[in-house]
């Protein structure tokens, strides 16, 4: 059974000293596995935050193209690093602000919601 195999792999990782897991796709980790990791003190970075670099790099490319610029690898890398640090800070701060310190799934969800809600309010949509 797939779920049994997945849970077994989680136990093996835990016994081998795994301290952090970053999702590498859109929600590949089951809710049960996420809960297991969190309950066992494993830092869990959800895909919506951990994978934001791909979307951010696409946005940087579109910006570069629209302005007819040509950035070096180091320039793009510095901009991406700044974006990812900002995403991480927003995720961590949101989780802490709402009483879920260390729960990066909760933090990423809250921070994402706040960003969309703020944009909607700024546009007068709500």
Residue ranges and their predicted role:
Residues 1-12:
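Single conserved hydrophobic/aromatic residue that forms the stacking wall/gate
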Residues 15-126:
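Adenosine-phosphate binding glycine-rich loop
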